[in-house]
Amino acid sequence: MVLLTMIARVADGLPLAASMQEDEQSGRDLQQYQSQAKQLFRKLNEQSPTRCTLGAGAMTFHYIIEQGVCYLVLCEAAFPKKLAFAYLEDLHSEFDEQHGKKVPTVSRPYSFIEFDTFIQKTKKLYIDSRARRNLGSINTELQDVQRIMVANIEEVLQRGEALSALDSKANNLSSLSKKYRQDAKYLNMRSTYAKLAAVAVFFIMLIVYVRFWWL
């Protein structure tokens, strides 16, 4: 289930729009997550990963960054990641069309709170079980969600690091993995060439032997 949706400007973390689950009990529980989301917005910058998943206990944050705007959603951990990112992409398309040009000029928090109407409508579409099945089939072209950076929200907030630092570590690991694969490929090629050379030497020696001893 989609429980909390927030949109913020990356440059300064200014909240632009938000929508929270209307259920009273969930509303009380979600205050902590809303606070975490605001802290997260303040840590974002131009070098932050543009797609990220952050574990938060029984809940999960997902966000995307497009044109300097962060679109974030809080879901139950069991909610499909693919649908969560498809939901965020839908919000981005509509929000950018309606308010994209005005984003750099606003200074008041929640200047586009009226966007909640579209958020609520889209959220219902993704929560409905039948609609979710349909969305699952039409979004097969969505980017590979397995490649999206994954972290823990508490660790990110407590460590005090900008998300760009985490992104750098992820990139470093990716580079090391790529180098390992390249080195392994190089060693395999050398091994193959060595075997071929040994076979070639054997046949050359055989030819020389036959020529000098049998002819």
From Swiss-Prot:
Matching Pfam families: Longin (PF13774), Synaptobrevin (PF00957)
Q: Which residues form the signal peptide?
A: none
- Tell me which residues bear Phosphoserine: 137, 164, 168, 174, 177
Where does the record say this protein resides? Answer: Endoplasmic reticulum membrane; Endoplasmic reticulum-Golgi intermediate compartment membrane; Golgi apparatus, cis-Golgi network membrane; Golgi apparatus, trans-Golgi network membrane
Q: Which SMART domains match?
A: Longin
Entry GO MF terms: SNAP receptor activity
Q: GO terms for CC?
A: endoplasmic reticulum membrane; endoplasmic reticulum-Golgi intermediate compartment membrane; Golgi apparatus; melanosome
Under which name does UniProt file this protein?
A: Vesicle-trafficking protein SEC22b
- Which regions span the lipid bilayer? 195-215
Question: What is the protein's species of origin?
Answer: Cricetulus griseus
| Protein family per UniProt | Belongs to the synaptobrevin family.
Keywords in UniProt for this one? Acetylation, Coiled coil, Endoplasmic reticulum, ER-Golgi transport, Golgi apparatus, Membrane, Phosphoprotein, Protein transport, Transmembrane, Transmembrane helix, Transport
The source's superkingdom equals Eukaryota
Location of the Longin domain: 6-119
Q: What is the lineage of its organism?
A: Eukaryota, Metazoa, Chordata, Craniata, Vertebrata
